[in-house]
Amino acid sequence: MVLIRVLANLLILQLSYAQKSSELVIGGDECNINEHRFLAIVHTDISLCTGTLINQEWVLTAAHCDRGDILVLLGVHRLKDVQTRVAKEKFICPNRKKDNEKDKDIMLIRLDSPVNNSTHIAPLSLPSNPPSVGSVCRIMGWGAITSPNVTFPGVPHCADINIFDYEVCRAAKPELPATSRTLCAGILEGGKGSCDGDSGGPLICNGEIQGIVSWGGDICAQPREPGHYTKVFDYTDWIQSIIAGNTDVTCPP
């Protein structure tokens, strides 16, 4: 009954989001059922986000997805092999700017009990090195696949995008700071990209989570307007310290 209620709420949230903006993976195809074993639905009563399982007890997502009590669903693809967990603890950078959702947009969720690896559930590795400019990386999510007349596929969709130099994102938005702990990624001609409905989801390069979907333009997947992804490599020490029990650690400035 809990799962049915959550899935009904997810549909309502998706329809609500679709009326406000294009919150979706644009230009993708249905993910292979075996390629998103780490993908999580991060659900609250008022929001829908995505997350990434990084070990049996921890999920990585975006800090701006912290909007109340969180329920995490894993193994979701046509409702096969689903495991449901409640967020036991949530960790956000203590030095994050409270008035800026884009600042240090990363959150660790500790589950109330470990998940079991299965055919459709397994963690994704943290990055060993940062991605290179020009790398082809993978995004995925459950959002609509068309816009503005939305169509919901009912399964996660995936798309390949490119890592750009940060200056490409600054060219689209000159007000951005000179440096950033984010990755700039997308397709220069537009047509593929993630958006708000995929917030917290992974940017995957060479089998590792390199980015977390953070923010983008008001209209998604527009030409010369790449998306912004929290650069996970810069936060690996913080992540590993939290998991090890050092909850007083701060994030890099």
UniProtKB/Swiss-Prot annotation:
Assigned EC number: 3.4.21.-
InterPro entries: Peptidase_S1_PA, Peptidase_S1_PA_chymotrypsin, Peptidase_S1A, Trypsin_dom, TRYPSIN_HIS, TRYPSIN_SER
Catalytic residues as annotated in Swiss-Prot or TrEMBL: 64, 105, 199
This protein's name: Snake venom serine proteinase 14
Principal location class: secreted
PROSITE patterns: TRYPSIN_DOM (PS50240), TRYPSIN_HIS (PS00134), TRYPSIN_SER (PS00135)
Biological process, per Gene Ontology: proteolysis
Keywords: Disulfide bond, Glycoprotein, Hemostasis impairing toxin, Hydrolase, Protease, Secreted, Serine protease, Signal, Toxin, Zymogen
Record organism: Crotalus adamanteus
Family: Belongs to the peptidase S1 family. Snake venom subfamily.
Claim: tRNA processing is one of the keywords in the record: no
Function text: Snake venom serine protease that may act in the hemostasis system of the prey.
The protein's enzyme class: hydrolase
Calcium recorded as keyword: no
Signal sequence region: 1-18
